[in-house]
Amino acid sequence: MKLIEQHQIFGGSQQVWAHNAQTLQCEMKFAVYLPNNPENRPLGVIYWLSGLTCTEQNFITKSGFQRYAAEHQVIVVAPDTSPRGEQVPNDAAYDLGQGAGFYLNATEQPWATNYQMYDYILNELPDLIEANFPTNGKRSIMGHSMGGHGALVLALRNRERYQSVSAFSPILSPSLVPWGEKAFSAYLGEDREKWQQYDASSLIQQGYKVQGMRIDQGLEDEFLPTQLRTEDFIETCRVANQPVDVRFHKGYDHSYYFIASFIGEHIAYHAEFLK
């Protein structure tokens, strides 16, 4: 691991590290916020998964989460959204390739060699965090848009690994919307059965459950009618008896202005599960 950046903020330390990711076969960066913790007590960890086009930088520079992580004494980890590097396959479009890993394990070439983000987020990154920082072994996960999709899928499929899950403006039925259909076709092939393991709505229909989930969605979000399918997800959860707290917010869009407005409530929500 190599320290790339370090900034003091709200009494704690916002850091960016680089490491050679075996799962992805490339160098990866991740951000970690360490609240002021002079006694080096073990703390819970919240993983944040960002959306399309993002790196590890967007969340740490735009959301203002550090104030709340410091207050609630939680470590927050924000990885990049895909493998990176000149040797890593890419696409000219914003919604495929680098910056658009979709938090899955690709099976199709040329993507399969590097695009194993599901395994990276589930196993390699937490192992690295827990070996190098003062953690208590408890994890929660949250994300935005493509990252909200990733957070929900990881939590549903690995209930024992995450204490809680939340999302901002998540892609809830990627198998049925343009973003997901494009990415899944490329990464997983044309067999739609293979897509279902990375579709939160489908997982709930299959019987996967979590203790509860929290979702915030802006009503001025330009992607709400075509890409997110929030109302359908609420109905899927109702039929499956899966508790979900979805809050719609008048006037808010898909941007980090929306995330910054409510990130404090999400940090507080997860902190209760991480004690």
Swiss-Prot record:
A Pfam match: Esterase
Biological role: Serine hydrolase involved in the detoxification of formaldehyde. Hydrolyzes S-formylglutathione to glutathione and formate.
Protein's name in the database: S-formylglutathione hydrolase
Listed transmembrane segments: none
Record keywords: Hydrolase, Serine esterase
EC category name: hydrolase
GO molecular function list: carboxylic ester hydrolase activity; S-formylglutathione hydrolase activity
Upper lineage: Bacteria, Pseudomonadati, Pseudomonadota, Gammaproteobacteria, Pasteurellales
Gene Ontology CC entries for this record: cytosol
EC number: 3.1.2.12
GO biological process, one term: formaldehyde catabolic process
Known catalytic reactions: S-formylglutathione + H2O = formate + glutathione + H(+)
Active site: S145 (charge relay system), D221 (charge relay system), H254 (charge relay system)
The species this protein was found in: Haemophilus influenzae (strain ATCC 51907 / DSM 11121 / KW20 / Rd)
Presence of the UniProt keyword Manganese in the record: no
Family: Belongs to the esterase D family.
Disulphide connectivity of cysteines: none
UniProt-listed NCBIfam families: fghA_ester_D
Stored InterPro entries: AB_hydrolase_fold, Esterase-like, S-formylglutathione_hydrol
